[in-house]
Amino acid sequence: MTVSENSVLETEVLVGGSAMPNERPGAMEPQSLTEMPEGFPRRSTVANGVRSRSSRRFFVVGGALLLSSFAIYEMGAVFSIGGITPLEYLVLLLFAINFCWIALAFCSGIAGFLILLRKPKAKDLEVTELHTRTAILMPTYNESPDRVFSAVSVMAEALSQTGHGHAFDWFILSDTTDPEIALLEEQAFLVLRQETHKHSRVYYRRRRKNVARKAGNVADFCRRWGSRYDHLLVLDADSLMESSTITGLAQRMQADPDAGLIQTIPSLINGTTLMARLQQFAARIYGPVIGTGLGWWVQKEGNFWGHNAIIRTEAFMGAAGLPNLKGKPPFGGHILSHDFVEAALIRRAGWSVVIAYDLPGSYEECPPSIVDLAVRDRRWCQGNLQHSRILPTKGLHWVSRLHLLTGIMAYLSSPFWLLLILTGLMLALQAHFIRPEYFTDQFSLFPTWPIMDSDRALRLFYITMGVLFGPKIFGVLLLLKDGQFARSVGGRIKAIFSVLFEVVLSALIAPIMMFIHCGAVMSILMGRDSGWSPQRRDDGSMPWLTLIYRHRWHMLAGVMLGYAAILDSLTLLAWMSPALIGLWFAVPISAWTGSVKIGEVFKRAGILATPEERSPAAICLQAQDARAAYQAHISKPWTLAQLLKDPALMELHLAMVDKQPLRAAGTPIEPVEAIVHVKVHEAQCQESAMALFNRQEMALVLANPLMLRSLQKLPEQFVAEDLVSFC
């Protein structure tokens, strides 16, 4: 169904009813981290409904510990021949930390590989009528409205055709602070309502103040409307989900009364730059190995990744209210990486948290460039390091603590790897420049030689590389074994070439990301907050001068490390060159990988192709077409001046403004709100008032009916006659 601009503007009432349903308030109290809440954990409804098999943990975690113990012993043996020096002890410690980290991923990969060898199918549930109600939430923050609303449009239409559409309501929960985007969202919502009101219930709400970011956005919905629904299916602004996946999640939740959260493993789609396509390919070829293995061994103690998951409302509201951490950001204040914590709290309360690794049809997008990845990772890094305050929480399952620790290590591993490189380099320089003390103060007939077991060291290097690249190797083996899978990415030969290209390019990018993560950790330790910047999702290109500024320290670090290596020998420089080349050429690598044009060249060549790119799902194609249509519908943004001039348009806008009560008289007032009140009160006309507003103030005015009514009472323009009469 198409909607012309005129038909939208001529509509004087909101098609499909109010922008939001009637509120049904419910409690969602912040949970204590120091005490176990009374009544937790709940008694399971089904016998063993939240019990996991310990044998799977023994295989993966026990295997990782055994493998790590062997590697650490071997590393100690490398140094022990000539006696271990303090610097060698430091190398051994750093090696132990880093190896344990990769060993867990390797053993998870083995489990995933063995499961995927059998080509498991999604668990078939008896198709029954859904008697539960699910709210599908799409939080958005300064995103392109055409992307968000077109995605909801196609998903809602597809879901309505399954016969289960009556069991779902759709909510676009906006935290947008850009006034122009906010008005575009309203235009897009009118189009969406015109398209869907006959078969779906779709709602829209923009918060006046985005307290606690995305977690606060969802919590606000829960406290005001959550009690109307049995489940919450949380999406992200770039999410897509097939109707069969949506209904499958709801049916699984309905069939398992002890399920608190079911997380899907999204596939990456719509990558246009080389960097995005690199991530898509890696996630598609190697990701299922890790994801399947993880879901297999964590069982009922899974994790939440913030979106593309269904949550039982009772479990979420009753157990996952987030407290504010003591102190100021970056370690205090609102919990940024809320998803891991919410999953841990839901499991603590006695509900199961499951990763549905067998359920396809879940999609998301990825950052288009190294710089965009760095911006996102800076925020995630702060949130994950904040989890160090959550680890001691009373009553958490040990697997939940391991999830939190794994998230922390995702970023701390970079400083540890860098320290390992630096200490190894120091060992080499020490052996080259510092004369060894062959005869110590203690009497001995034999000298003390600085000896290492080179054969054992080389063998350990091969083992470490095998563990590090093991999940990639497993993914490639599965690809080569499955002829249909291989054909879906262009055939085995092209797939092998793509894998080799991915390995080389990832190796060049890895040291850049290592230094980016090191910088993020350092800035957090120095007390700097990440803020909340909207994400770029399409073009990752930037001016070269901007990239030089962004990567200046990475290039300098590469030069310094290269100089230190060449002081020892050309051989050491050659060994370090895989890491150094990426740093030396950080700027062109960042520019080329963020280019849509270069990404298109590789797409035409069939390099880094994925099944989702070569044969997109129907929902993905429909979303692309719908987005183009929405771009045309909202090509002429509304303005505040138009709202003030057109009473019908103003009524449409006010119908979409959040109905949350305004500040009561005599209560504290926000500084920005006070400033706006003064500006409106002192303005002589609408034109002069609007000229005084900045973007933050404009967004506040758009969300405040009283201020809008006050502006409406002012004349459009100030004329000279008014001044004469005033005098």
From Swiss-Prot:
GO MF, any single term: hexosyltransferase activity
Any one biological process term the GO annotation gives: glucan biosynthetic process
Transmembrane regions: 58-78, 90-110, 278-298, 408-428, 460-480, 496-516, 572-592
Keywords associated with the record: Cell inner membrane, Cell membrane, Glycosyltransferase, Membrane, Transferase, Transmembrane, Transmembrane helix
GO cellular component: plasma membrane
Pfam families: Glyco_trans_2_3
Subcellular location: Cell inner membrane
Main localization category: membrane
Membrane topology listed for this record: Multi-pass membrane protein
Function: Involved in the biosynthesis of osmoregulated periplasmic glucans (OPGs).
Family as reported in the entry's similarity comment: Belongs to the glycosyltransferase 2 family. OpgH subfamily.
Protein name (record): Glucans biosynthesis glucosyltransferase H
Originating organism: Shewanella sp. (strain W3-18-1)
